[in-house]
Amino acid sequence: ILGVSVMTLSRHLNQLQHRVGTSLLTRHSKGMQLTNEGSRLVEYLERAEAEIEAAGSIFEARGQSVSGTVRIAAPEGFALKVLTPNLATLLREHPDLNVEIVPQTLGFSLSRREADIAVMVGHPNEGQLHSELLGTYDLGLYASESYVTAYGMPTTIDELLNHRLIGYVEDLLFSERLNIARQVASEWVSNLAIYSPIGQVEAVRAGLGIGVLHEFLLDHDEGLVSVLPELRFSREFFLVSHPTTARVPRIQAMLTF
């Protein structure tokens, strides 16, 4: 990608670390990761890149498309049901723009430059990030009509806990804000645990149990019925970016589309 060999890149990195007098990267089982000092240096470099690109854009012909790659980290449901279907207009306007959509995994950090932009559930708790409220979404308990016919409809939380329950694989959750099931009942134990909210919708639709589902994923599915409808939950989506890169044309195009 950089047009240089690994050996050359390693040599330049070692020279840079020697010059600044500290380690900028650490090695681990999955590759390399920026140290705190490395992240601070990247902030300065990205600010310089943003200023250079912004200055260059002054001389670009009006209407000229931006180019390059923007990486967006987003929850699966938002990425597949909201973001992806709305990209056509943006990419038609900027045909030289490439977009990478990646999942938010446990330990994800936008501050460590793991993505250019992130869509997060709840306000980010990392400093030095710009955030903007995108909107809210609702969640509720649902079962399939076939499940209710076979096993009955719970009318209390105690009755609910005696049913087959569907939820997340809890130790893979990148945010506790997603663990709505524990808000329903601290004793909640998922008989079927699925990492994917879309997978949970499909499992409930198949009659495998009762789950807390994102309502924007349901598409007014007539095969599902609300369980304990008085239990409603809301969460917020925030658009989060690095202040130092917001003026880079390709990132600005994505932030404003």
Residues covered by each model-derived region:
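The DNA-contacting recognition helix of HTH DNA-binding domains
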Residues: 6-7, 80
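C-terminal regulatory
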Residues: 112, 124-237
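Alpha-helical linker/hinge and terminal dimerization helices associated
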Residues: 19-20, 41-63
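Residues within the DNA-recognition helix of helix-turn-helix
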Residues: 5, 12, 86
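Conserved amphipathic alpha-helical core elements
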Residues: 16-17, 224
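A short LG(V/I)-centered, amphipathic sequence patch enriched
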Residues: 17-34
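A late-sequence structural motif
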Residues: 230-257
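Central regulatory/effector-binding core of bacterial HTH transcription factors
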Residues: 67-127
